[in-house]
């Protein structure tokens, strides 16, 4: 019963191609040897690699030797007819001679012919029929046992039903080969008998053999039987069988079947030569094997499920590029999957027409990857790629910047920068980009792939676009013009370069890199702030000692005009002294502050205002002597000009930056003042050597050698209260300069170097500063500490004569003659031309006098700045007029010294401040007079 069931299953599946088998003759086994060598070299072994269940094919378990003998037969997957099982079946049917079945009647033969033609089930299109035709099974140890059992059952049945058939079978057993002994004729149910057990046995007894005979002997027997069949008038039976219509297929196969007649048509053809029609069959086999190469052998897939439309794609891939490994991987499918057990299929939105046009295009070799030039920035275009695919929508960009589509070369990782490597498909993950709207619209038939520089999954981080605007968006435009909590009211006219630069840098954010964007944002903020300081609004907020106040009620016009006239009086380009201003400066402190902070510059060159806050205690002293204070003089002698504020004030009056890459983060390496060094009164540097008067530098440098040996010159600066108002060269709270320093500030012939900055604005007891050498690290434009820390400014303008001297020797102003609500103040100023230096001290809280002692007095530094903080008056300043030549503004001790360029016709020498001197050098004109 087991054999009968197996034969019945084979009968239902096996006869699958004989309806058209008479049109195309099949070759014998010898010509298929060459096909086996060429086709199976793709698989690299003799064992079966595509073993499918037996019900997919048309042969049973006992046919395995026959299939190995036949080799790779033609598998026609287009019309769904498989001829594999009928190649050997035709020979076995012809070997069952017609003389053995002469008892069969003509109606039976005609019914058998029609049943045979109807019993050919149409197999499924695709690779299933292909695999069933090229299967190579390994040898089964139970083949001999099954053959003997089938022989005994078929012999006993045939002896009862068909007399004389068993002797003929036994006679033929001497002539059959081992391959034909395994052939199992598909049994067909009998129409006359209802037994399900007898019919398979009756069909089996036609092909079961026991003994094995050589190939040559079997061929001679076949030729004899074919000749004998022709003599008995098989042509008449063939004509009758073709004219009959389709009836039922429940008819047993007889010796007069069409398979026998098909074999008789090939009698004159030698066994060693294939027929002419075999060339087309070999080409089809090559096409099918090549499709298996792309589907199975190289990609390592296990279960393969393909559609019917994939057959045309698989066949067309052979002509595309058969010898290339990379083209072979991706030839038969658009999307490649790796790994075992995965299903291979195309996306749902891609049909057969799209794939066919894809592979027939001129750029079939560049379907998956479009390399671009290594040095080009523009995306590569294929002939059939539309220009609209890479043209961006400029309306979405805030700057109207054209965005181009990214080529795979633009998506390379940092490790594989500008590598034109072909994408590899060895890792088992889907390495294709997600199809978007452009891919689905089929306007672009090529889908870009992400390249990889190795066989690892390093293409995952390449999904990001290199445009960093997605990662770091620009600042909101509303908060762009705010600085330390105070709104910056800059001029927003289109002609203003500051506003245009700020708008470009902040609102759009169209920078190349993040560093340049940050630099331009800082630059724009500082420019807006400086522009706001030069053109302030009524409601500008300034904070002083953590207290905000509004200066909208301060009259600005009169104070600016008066101060400008005072400044113009001091220099040759101004009117003579006799034409000095007659009216006094308003006595409101806010007016003086407004004029000092926001006085507009008359020209494009540097015209800063220098602010010095002093703490003199008004007291008259007839002897003109100054007694030093032992408690404060040594602790405050190292305090000097705030270097950062001088550079900030210089930046306010100079031109904009020419290079956008210059940083404003306060680094000393990249200075943004290079393009505007002409506007600087003296060269700003950190290690300065006076090249013109080296002797004077040597005299000053000896004083600080001992201090440099004490500690490191780069002590961390921790005092954040030293940054004063922006437009000030120097501001020292609760201390003052001597006459020499005041003369240099007025003549504008001094340079800036690294100076100590323990200024401690607003503190009642400033800390003891370190030596000068310990605090000479400069932090120019330290944006972290740019604050509006303004003190209560009391202004005082000193007398400056026409010869360029610092002060008049005998200029004395008595405060008792003025309307001044404080203690009488008497200031005696002498010149430094004779080498004098100035010391400050106070004997009590009510009097103070300035004296210029001789240089013979032993001091540690060329100048020291003592602090008098025990008394500070907050009364309003007073203005007076002295001798009609100059105007002196007296206040609570703070002095305002306006500075401008030297008089016209006078060539000042830029005398820089050394790192270790701490004081400006003496001008050659001043030292030559006395």
Curated annotation (Swiss-Prot):
GO terms classed as biological process: negative regulation of canonical Wnt signaling pathway; negative regulation of Wnt signaling pathway; positive regulation of canonical Wnt signaling pathway; regulation of canonical Wnt signaling pathway; Wnt signaling pathway
Residue stretches of biased makeup (Polar residues): 377-399, 413-424
Protein name: APC membrane recruitment protein 1
Organism: Danio rerio
Compositionally biased tracts (Basic and acidic residues): 222-242, 439-452
Keywords associated with the record: Cell membrane, Cytoplasm, Lipid-binding, Membrane, Nucleus, Wnt signaling pathway
Family: Belongs to the Amer family.
Localization per record: Cytoplasm; Cell membrane; Nucleus
């Amino acid at each position: 019963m087991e054999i009968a069931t197996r034969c019945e299953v084979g009968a239902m599946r096996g006869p699958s191609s004989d309806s058209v088998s008479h049109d195309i003759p099949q070759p014998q086994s010898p010509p298929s040897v060459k096909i086996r060598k060429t086709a199976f070299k793709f698989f690299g072994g003799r064992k079966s690699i595509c073993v499918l269940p037996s019900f997919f094919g048309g042969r049973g378990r006992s046919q395995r030797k026959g299939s190995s003998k036949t080799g790779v037969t033609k598998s026609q997957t287009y019309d769904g007819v498989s001829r594999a099982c009928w190649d050997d079946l035709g020979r076995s049917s012809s070997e069952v001679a017609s003389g053995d079945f002469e008892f069969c009647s003509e109606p039976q033969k005609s019914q058998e012919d029609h049943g045979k033609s109807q019993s050919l089930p149409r197999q499924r299109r695709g690779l299933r029929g292909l695999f069933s035709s090229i299967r190579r099974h390994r040898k089964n140890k139970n083949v001999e046992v099954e053959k003997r059992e089938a022989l005994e059952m078929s012999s006993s049945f045939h002896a009862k039903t068909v007399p004389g058939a068993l002797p003929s079978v036994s006679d033929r057993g001497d002539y059959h080969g081992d391959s034909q002994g395994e052939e199992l004729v598909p049994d067909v149910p009998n129409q006359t008998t209802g037994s399900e057990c007898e019919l398979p046995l009756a069909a089996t007894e036609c092909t079961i053999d026991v003994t094995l005979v050589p190939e040559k002997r079997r061929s001679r027997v076949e030729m004899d039987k074919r000749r004998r069949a022709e003599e008995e008038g098989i042509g008449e039976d063939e004509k009758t069988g073709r004219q009959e219509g389709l009836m039922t297929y429940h008819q047993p196969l007889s010796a007069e079947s069409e398979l026998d007649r098909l074999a008789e048509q090939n009698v004159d053809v030698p066994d060693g030569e294939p027929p002419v029609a075999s060339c087309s069959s070999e080409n089809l086999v090559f096409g099918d094997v090549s499709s298996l190469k792309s589907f199975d052998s190289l990609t390592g897939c296990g279960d393969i499920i393909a559609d019917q439309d994939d057959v045309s794609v698989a066949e067309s891939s052979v002509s595309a590029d058969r010898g290339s490994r990379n083209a072979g991987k991706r030839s038969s499918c658009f999307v490649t999957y790796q790994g075992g057990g995965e299903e291979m299929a195309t996306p749902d939105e891609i049909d057969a027409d799209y794939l066919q046009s894809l592979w027939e295009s001129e750029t079939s070799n560049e379907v998956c990857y479009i390399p671009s030039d290594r040095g080009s920035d523009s995306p590569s275009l294929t002939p059939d790629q539309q220009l609209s695919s890479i043209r961006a929508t400029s309306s979405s960009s805030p700057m109207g910047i054209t965005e181009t589509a990214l080529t795979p070369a633009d998506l390379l990782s940092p490790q594989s920068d500008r590598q034109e490597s072909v994408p590899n498909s060895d890792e088992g993950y889907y390495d294709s980009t997600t199809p978007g709207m452009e891919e689905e619209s089929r306007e672009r038939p090529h889908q870009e792939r992400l390249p990889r520089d190795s066989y690892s999954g390093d293409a995952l981080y390449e999904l990001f676009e290199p445009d960093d605007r997605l990662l770091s968006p620009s600042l909101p435009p509303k908060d762009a013009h705010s600085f330390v909590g105070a709104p910056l009211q800059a001029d927003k006219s289109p002609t203003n370069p500051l506003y245009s630069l700020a708008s470009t840098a902040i609102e759009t954010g169209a920078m190349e890199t993040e560093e340049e964007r940050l630099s331009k944002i800082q630059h724009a903020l500082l420019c807006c702030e400086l522009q706001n300081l030069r053109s302030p609004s009524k409601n500008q907020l300034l904070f002083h000692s953590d207290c905000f106040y509004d200066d909208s009620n301060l009259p600005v016009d009169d104070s600016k005009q008066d101060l400008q006239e005072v400044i113009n009086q001091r220099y040759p380009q101004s009117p003579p002294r006799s034409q000095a201003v007659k009216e006094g400066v308003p006595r409101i402190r806010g007016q003086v502050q407004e004029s000092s902070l926001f006085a507009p510059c008359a020209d494009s060159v540097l015209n800063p205002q220098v602010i010095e806050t002093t703490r003199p205690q008004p007291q008259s002293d007839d002897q003109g002597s100054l007694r030093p204070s032992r408690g404060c003089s040594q602790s405050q002698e190292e305090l000097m000009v705030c270097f950062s504020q001088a550079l900030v004030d210089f930046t306010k009056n100079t031109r904009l930056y020419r290079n956008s890459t210059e940083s404003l983060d306060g680094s000393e390496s990249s200075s943004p003042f290079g393009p505007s060094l002409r506007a600087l009164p003296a060269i700003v540097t950190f290690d300065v050597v006076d090249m013109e008067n080296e002797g004077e530098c040597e005299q000053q440098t000896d004083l600080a050698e001992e201090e440099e040996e004490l500690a490191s010159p780069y002590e961390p600066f921790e005092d954040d209260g030293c940054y004063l108002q922006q437009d000030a060269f120097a501001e020292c709270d609760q201390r003052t300069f001597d006459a020499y320093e005041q003369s240099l500030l007025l003549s504008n012939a001094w340079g800036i170097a690294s100076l100590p900055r323990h200024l401690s604005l607003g503190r009642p007891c400033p800390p003891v500063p370190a030596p000068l050498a310990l605090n000479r690290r400069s932090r120019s434009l330290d944006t972290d500490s740019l604050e509006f820390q303004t003190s209560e400014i009391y202004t005082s303008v000193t007398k400056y004569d026409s010869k360029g001297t610092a002060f008049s020797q005998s200029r004395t102003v008595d405060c008792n003659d003025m309307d001044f609500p404080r203690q009488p103040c008497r200031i005696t100023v002498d010149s430094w031309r004779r080498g004098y230096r100035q010391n400050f001290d106070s004997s009590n809280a009510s009097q103070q006098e300035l004296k210029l002692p001789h240089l013979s007095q032993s001091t540690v530094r060329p100048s020291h700045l003592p602090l008098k903080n025990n008394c500070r008056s907050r009364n309003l300043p007073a203005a007076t007029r002295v001798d009609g030549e100059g105007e002196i503004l007296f206040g609570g001790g703070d002095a305002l010294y306006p500075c401008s360029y030297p008089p016209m016709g006078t060539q000042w020498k830029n005398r820089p401040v050394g790192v270790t001197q701490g004081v400006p050098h003496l001008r050659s004109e001043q030292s030559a007079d006395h």
